[in-house]
């Protein structure tokens, strides 16, 4: 998504955050590994909620596999946010007002960052392990014929 100059200025805060722009897909995981906090965002203004309600973004499994703290922003009644909440795999912000408070709390509490990173990694290993999913799938499809 291309951002306006105003949006770039709002996101780039001196000493806190910077916007790198676009990177090739093969560099995404490398950049995620370098990050302290991964930010997952859904539409908190209800514009696309009907389509996002039951969606499960592949970005979720990508983030979980990195073993990094996740800050998830979005309404509490959509699948991705419900999943993060149930799994205790992210710090949740359901409104715009919660973002700064939750982010400051994470920055001031490295122990909480590490705990949430561990929760995310464990959730990814437990629920999104490709080998385990293949085994379950083939077992369901082929049953005793394996």
Report each predicted region and the residues it spans.
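Short acidic active-site motifs
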Residues: 7, 26-28, 59, 98-102
